[in-house]
């Protein structure tokens, strides 16, 4: 029997280019929680070898979406709002990102996400909301 976490990871790598670009590894998925890891890569950095804020934000968005997915009983979801505080420069990978569902309503799922370096230092903290889609949305 195939590992369900690996199966989800493969589906996202095929369907989501940013997931593939960031080389996301899904560490854990359970109801209301997702943990992923991304590597340190030079192409992810800005001056001084510090991880670029856009990379951190993208990884947080992916992780929050995966956490929301674990409680979503509908067809799909989209990021509605994402607020982040960058707390420390990040330069020591791999980086661990953990999302925890705070509340699932009928139309919105609220998730808290933390971004940490290889030593467990908290580099960013975010809160976001994912809008629940009851019908599948396709790009035109």
From Swiss-Prot:
Entry superkingdom: Archaea
Pfam families: 4HBT
UniProt EC number: 3.1.2.-
GO molecular function: fatty acyl-CoA hydrolase activity
Organism from which the protein derives: Saccharolobus solfataricus (strain ATCC 35092 / DSM 1617 / JCM 11322 / P2) (Sulfolobus solfataricus)
Family in the record: Belongs to the thioesterase PaaI family.
Protein name, entry field: Putative esterase SSO2140
Hydrolase recorded as keyword: yes
Keywords carried by this UniProt record: Hydrolase
Signal peptide residue numbers: none
Gene3D superfamilies: Hotdog Thioesterase
Top enzyme category: hydrolase
